[in-house]
């Protein structure tokens, strides 16, 4: 880490305005957060009460706290009882989807996002101790790289020129959750009665379909191999006239010439006869194509990064894919060879005349969903929240997305009204200055809105509250067991 001298700190390098940091506005970030919340307050009104003040307090807690952002600890920063916050997050009937829809409307209205945006589909798993949490089960946890007791969410992120955020999400419920034996557990944990089993790919398509019916503009849909290898999903995207660049595994089979798919002549007329590939040409795995002598690689500069420039080798060619007797589809096979020599593959429905630079751009968008996941978890506290019931999971998602959008909108506004001093880059000897990160902006908010310090009286009240709750819990357990208190 660089150590700065006193003389350096007095130079332009440490001048806040040179970095686009408006000192006066930093001091009023709390007011800015309040005004942001006011736009969403109606989303938290129910038929019986207005719970919007809980939303403001919870949002503030997510942004200002750094660890252990659970319901009880956030409640303490709000000056509320944990029970009231628990009720707001778990049982109150406000709609998380209504909040997410308003976020997307505001993202769509942002002039900076008029073109060049990408939707990115991904999943993220969190470890769970047992199946007592909605959606939990032994399933693949990508972070751990193994099958483990986990709760998995599918998420849709929006990315644009260095900005990224979740804009939608769905909780994946494994198929065994829909068995008759789990009916009571589904009801206990608030799973909607009309919820049916859906694969992660189907949940992903539901979100894409939902967002594409709104006004949010984007130029490409990207996804990892879990979703990209789905012929069904790629077909759905094409039918909806949405451009995609979908990562696929190295063993994905494609044809270099259009195959003939039909019912074999000798089987025509039979009721159960199914179409199949009749061509003599055999399919090839995409990793075989990358090694062909006719495959030409060219270096493409995709974008500037904080580490320099993303310049990798790319190659692309037209191929055909088919599955289960469906008519073949012509797609781009996009291949990227990174700096370590590893080759990554994607299929895209970009037009046949699309230049390699455009294909390379689409191939390199998926990394931003990892940035969105990191910000949601590390900065906003998604992985610290412990939603046991279905409504709590949806409510947590809505408030985490609100927090991320508030930070992103603040950065966008400052970037537009308080740009970097061009002399600063020259003084530092670089051609590009780093933008504010979500972590940077949150640090400023935490300074402008410091958490309340715990007094002796406050700590005493918390201890008594804890003891009272333990006493009531024991009383409840004894009542459940049918015991009676002894007279002494």
Describe the residue ranges of each PLM region:
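Long, charge-rich low-complexity segments
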Residues: 111-112, 118, 442-488
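An anionic, glycine-rich sequence signature occurring as long contiguous blocks
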Residues: 162-193, 249, 254-368, 450, ...
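Short, solvent-exposed helix-loop connector elements
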Residues: 348, 354-363, 378-395, 414
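Short, hydrophobic/amphipathic alpha-helical patches that form generic packing surfaces
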Residues: 56-65, 155, 397-411, 446-450
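Conserved, well-structured functional cores that handle cations and Mg-NTP chemistry
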Residues: 9-222, 226-253, 260, 264-282, ...
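Conserved nucleotidyltransferase catalytic core and NTase-mimicking acidic/glycine-rich helix/loop elements
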Residues: 404-443
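Catalytic-loop motifs flanking and including active-site residues across diverse enzymes
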Residues: 152, 368, 372, 395-401
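Short, well-ordered loop/turn and helix-capping segments at boundaries between secondary-structure elements
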Residues: 352, 365, 369, 374, ...
């Amino acid at each position: 880490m660089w150590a700065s001298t006193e003389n350096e700190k007095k130079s332009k390098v440490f001048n806040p305005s040179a970095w686009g940091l408006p000192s006066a506005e930093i001091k009023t970030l709390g007011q800015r957060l309040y005004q942001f919340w006011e736009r969403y307050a109606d989303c938290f009104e129910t038929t019986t009460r207005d719970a919007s003040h809980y939303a403001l307090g919870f949002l503030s807690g997510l942004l200002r706290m750094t660890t252990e952002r659970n319901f009880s600890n956030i409640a303490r920063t709000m000056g509320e009882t944990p029970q009231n916050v628990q009720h707001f997050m778990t049982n109150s009937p406000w709609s998380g989807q209504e909040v997410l829809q308003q976020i997307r409307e505001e993202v769509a209205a942002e002039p900076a996002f008029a073109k060049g945006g990408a939707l990115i589909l991904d999943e993220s798993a969190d470890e769970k101790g047992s199946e007592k949490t909605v959606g939990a089960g032994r399933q693949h946890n990508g972070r751990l790289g193994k099958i483990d007791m986990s709760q998995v969410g599918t998420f849709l992120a929006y990315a644009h020129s260095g900005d990224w955020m979740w804009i939608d999400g769905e909780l994946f419920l494994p198929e065994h959750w829909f068995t008759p034996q789990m009916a009571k557990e589904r009801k206990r944990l608030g799973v909607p009665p009309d919820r049916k089993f859906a694969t992660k790919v189907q949940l992903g398509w539901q979100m894409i379909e939902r967002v594409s019916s709104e006004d949010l503009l984007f130029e490409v849909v990207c996804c990892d191999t879990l979703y990209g290898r789905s012929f069904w999903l790629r077909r759905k995207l094409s039918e909806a006239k949405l451009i995609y660049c979908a990562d696929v595994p190295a063993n994905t089979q494609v044809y270099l010439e259009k195959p003939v798919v039909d019912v074999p002549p000798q089987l025509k007329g039979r009721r159960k006869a199914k179409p199949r590939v009749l061509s003599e040409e055999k399919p090839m795995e995409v990793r075989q194509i990358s090694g062909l002598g006719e495959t030409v690689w060219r270096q493409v500069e995709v974008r500037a990064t904080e580490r320099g420039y993303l310049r990798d080798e790319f190659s692309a060619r037209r191929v055909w894919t088919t599955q289960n007797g469906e008519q073949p589809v012509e797609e781009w096979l996009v291949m990227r060879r990174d700096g370590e020599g590893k080759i990554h593959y994607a299929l895209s429905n970009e037009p046949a005349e699309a230049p390699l630079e455009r294909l390379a751009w689409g191939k390199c968008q998926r990394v931003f969903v990892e940035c969105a996941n990191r910000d949601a978890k590390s900065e906003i506290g998604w992985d610290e929240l412990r939603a046991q019931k279905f409504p709590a999971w949806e409510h947590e998602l809505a408030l985490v997305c609100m927090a991320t959008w508030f930070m992103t909108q603040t950065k966008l506004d400052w970037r537009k009204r308080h740009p970097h001093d061009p002399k600063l880059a020259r003084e530092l000897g670089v051609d590009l200055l780093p933008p504010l990160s979500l972590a940077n902006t949150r640090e400023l908010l935490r300074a402008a809105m410091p958490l309340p310090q715990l007094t002796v009286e406050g700590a005493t009240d918390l201890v008594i509250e804890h003891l009272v709750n333990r006493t009531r819990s024991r009383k409840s357990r004894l009542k459940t067991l049918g015991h009676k208190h002894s007279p002494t």
